[in-house]
Every structure is written in structure tokens, then in C-alpha cells.
Amino acid sequence: MTNSSNQNDNGNNRRGFLHQSVLGTAVAGMTIASNSHVTAQTLADASEPEITQTVDVLVVGGGTAGHVAAIQAGRTGAKTLIVERNSQLGGTTTTGGVAFPGLFDAWGKQVIAGIGWELVKESVELDGGTLPNFAKVPQRHWQNQVFTNQFLYAILAEQKCAEAGVEIAYYEFPQTVTKTDDGWQVDCVGFGTRRRVQCKQIIDSTGGAEVVGMVGLPRLREEERQPGSYLFMLGKEHEPGRNQINRLYVHGADSTNSRTATEANLTGRKAILERVRQKKQRLMHMQPETGFRETYRIEGETVITVNDYTSGRVFDDAISYAFYPVDLHTKSGVRPKPLKRGTVPTISLSALIPKGSRNIIVAGRCVSSDRLANSGLRVQASCMGMGQAAGVAASLAAKADSTPLEVPLPEIHAMLREHGQIVPTKA
């Protein structure tokens, strides 16, 4: 009888603890809404530490550009694997907490659509949110950024991958990358897992062109990096998809490796704790890590300059529009420099190709560009556009046993249009 009583007391204490832990405090009358459950699929090879597989396209990095690239490659018919070191897809939009991506429009019309827009639109609609009116030119550029529910977005991205036949490998990252006669051998490591992947094409969407660096191809880097941002909410409840949250600059934030990323996160969290104590407010929400703006960029077959960007140059091999002010963040803050009315920059396919390379393409903020051009190109909608183009180019190259830059541009453009993307055209 005594043992039974102790067990009941322990159970009650545990439930009470759970009630108090939901927002870090006790709330009168709070209960757990339901105790529903699901069962994860039992993996046949779960006890095997080593996995060997062959795919057409390996996407490294499931962030803003990477998950779009993977979905596109899968939809194009390529056998696709995406490797992501974190626990979810979406990158800046989800893990980074910048759940107000942009810009999909310019000067009264939509200029970036496709898979990225499909995900953003569905996440807003599923959350009962409101989409901006792109026919209206806002006074400030950020007014047409789209508020999304970051949690819904991450789940929808996984669903789209599953529907496209894309395999996801979380908590893994390449350890070695070796060139082969018909592509690459990539050895990835995760906890309890060693995965050897034979692939025809690699899409490097790591943000800092980590795979490009691993294979010895040239990268560009500034002595001073733009600060990262750590997002959090003090004093009032954060409503995903409804409001913006507080931002803390983490100067020197560097995503180059686990040590530099750890330092950025420790620095950011320490500063947030100091702010909580100073303001005597409750910490209601905090993202799991710093959002990084700048590390490495590739040296590509084309380098997009700030003059290319601000003049709205339409490259002969343009595969996506981009639209955002020149937006360089420094220790003194940021002063966006808006583009002249009617100007819409473009992104060239050759700016996604590391110089002198074959069978590898990048997507995202590591696009080949000078620093000022990159400060506008690195934003989410543009990265999604790059991701979709990289997915098309890599999958078509794999199918033809070719390399992305040798795929006929009309084929890339046709496939992009087929999947809803807006392809730049010359006036």
C-alpha cells in the first residue's frame, strides 16, 4: 500500500512539474491538452552503424536554399538525399527564427515564386494568416515580408520532401568528399551513424560553401563578418506567424565549424540572460541558435558585383530574380540602400558554379558575389530561387551524365517554369 501511494505521489509530482514547465512557470488551471501518441517506423538497419547508398543528387544543408533544392531535384525525378546537421529543415526561416521571409515581389508584381513560395503560402494559409498584396508597392521594403509560422513551415518542408521521394538524414554532415569517375563519394558522420554516399551531383547549400572548401575549390571571405542575429522574446508571448521578436546582434558570429558556431551561441545566450536580469522581464521565447549572415562565398565562374546588382543586370544565363536593398550590417547597425525604382536584379547560373569545377553546384548565401551584392542576395526568397535552380540543374545533369553548367539553358528554364518559378527575361 505504501509503495502504491508513493508511486501515485511521484506521478502527481511529475504531472505538476510538466504543468509548470510549459512556459517555465506555473499557470493556474493549466493542463496537458491531450496524451495522444504516434509510433515511429522501425528501421531495418537501425542497429547498423554503417550505411552505404547510391543517389543521383546529394544536397548538403537543409536550410533556406537546400530544402527547396532537394524538393525540386526529387520532383524532377532524381534519386535525392538531403543531409542536415540540425533537427529540421528551413534554416534561417525555422531554426534561425527569421519567420518573415522576403522578398518575393518588386515594384507591384511577384518576381520569385516556385517551390519556396508554395511552402510559404501554404504555411500562412494553414495558420490562418494573411498574405501581402504584391500589387501594392510598400513604403518600406520589409512591409511585404511574409509572416509565417516557423513550426508549420518546418513540418510542411518535410512533407514536401516525402512526397517528392527525398530521403532526409538529420544530425549528419560530410567528413570527407572524394572525387570519383562519375561523381563523388561522400562519407558522412552522425551520432551512431557512418554513411557512405555515392552520388553523381552535389548541391552545396551549407551557407558557407563547406563542401566546396572540403574539395579544395576557391572561396572568398572578408576579414570582418556581418554580425549574426539571435532572436528571442521578452515579456509577452510570442505568436508564430503573427509578430516579430527581439533581435540581438552577435558580432563576429562565424558558422565555419562547430567551435565557432558554439562560441556564437554561447555569446548570444549569455547576453540574453543579462538582458533578462536587467529588464526584469520573463523570457518567453528563444531560438535554438544564432542566425548567421556571412562566412564564405564561392569564387564562381561568374562573380556578381554590386554594380550588377544595383543596375538590375539581366545575365545571359539568369535563373532567378532577386530583390532586396543592399543590406550590409556592421557594428554601427544597418542602413539599407534601396534599389532605384523599377530595378530588379538577377542571379546567373554560372555564379552558382565553383570556378573550375564539375558535378557540384551551390545555392544560397555562398553565391559567387562581392560583399555588397551578397548583402542583398543572401535573403530568403532569393536563396529559395537559387535552390530551385540548383535542383533543376543538378538533376538534369545527373540524368544526362553531364555537369550543371553543360545542361542546355533552355532545358533549365523550361523545367523551372514547369514547376512554377518565374524566369528572368530581357526587355
Task: Annotate each PLM feature.
Residues R14-T31:
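N-terminal export leaders
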Residues V22, Q72, A78-K79, R85-T176, ...:
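Conserved N-terminal/central alpha/beta ligand/cofactor-binding core
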Residues Q41-T54:
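A short, basic/flexible loop-to-alpha-helix module at the beginning of a structural domain
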Residues I51-G63:
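Beta1/beta-strand and adjacent pyrophosphate-binding region of the FAD-binding site
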Residues G66:
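N-terminal Rossmann-fold NAD(P) dinucleotide-binding loop
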Residues T92-T93, A154, Y171, G190-Q201, ...:
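Flavin (FAD/FMN)-binding glycine-rich loop and adjacent Rossmann-like elements that form
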Residues T178-R196:
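Conserved beta-strand-loop-beta-strand element in the redox core of flavoprotein oxidoreductases
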